[in-house]
Amino acid sequence: MPNEKNVVSFRAADGNTVKLEYIDSLPSAEALAREYARSGYPDRYAVFTERQTSLSALGEVISEKDSEKGLFLSCILRPSIFPSQAGCIGPLSAVALAAALEEHTMKNIGIGWLSDIYCDGIRIGTTSVEGKLDDFTSYEYLIVSFAVKLDPKKFTPRLTDMVKQVFEDGNQSISMIMAKTVLNRFFTIYKEIKAPQKHLNHYVDRFVLKDKKIKYIDEGKKKTARVVDINKENLTLVIETKDGRRISVSSRSAVIIPNKI
């Protein structure tokens, strides 16, 4: 178990206790959370670092010399839900991260597809969800991860200044306060996971790719298309090709979405 001085407990907005372990630098918060989950760590145990050395906030593999500073947060869940009920956790985690950033920065934060986070037209972070099923087709664990690079190269300087102004609070770092805010926002939404429609509506409202040009893969070739919208029922991406055809895309690997829109 980790040294207790690196772990803080707090009551989340939904009334349940969350344990948050801080480590100043990690190759991957998600990888450590996965290791903890397999070792039996409890529900709502989160791992947080401000410096990640093997994976960027956008999910790209990096070297240690290119390590990123920011918010890298992964939380273990042990839910009593079936896979069919878990499909919306990814989009809902993006709603939580966007709301947390917006709460503290006074900036309009948008969501791409399915879980990319945008500010001022630049992709600044993402969320992800992974899990392991037990022998009864329910989850042994889920891990929900949040990542945002707090760097002027990804954030505009004005956004960085606003974050610093709001987050200065005693000895807590900017990112630590943000991590707690993200978890509070997420668990407020997560408690309604079996009836998530109003939160999915927030996802649709924050969608920023409408009318943007992206690439899609057609018979192994990259082609340009315009984003029409997202399907509000199943969150598939609706695109229009150059010849006017409309296609519904359900796989993230079938499209290439730029980091700057």
Residue positions per predicted region:
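N-terminal lobe of the biotin/lipoate ligase/transferase fold
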Residues: M1-E102, L133
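Long, positively charged amphipathic alpha-helical accessory segments at protein N-termini or as interdomain linkers
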Residues: P2, G15, P79-I109, C119-I261
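Short loop/edge segments at beta-strand edges and connector loops
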Residues: D24, I111-W113, Q197
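Short, basic and Ser/Thr-rich N-terminal targeting/leader segments
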Residues: Y41-D43, W113, K221
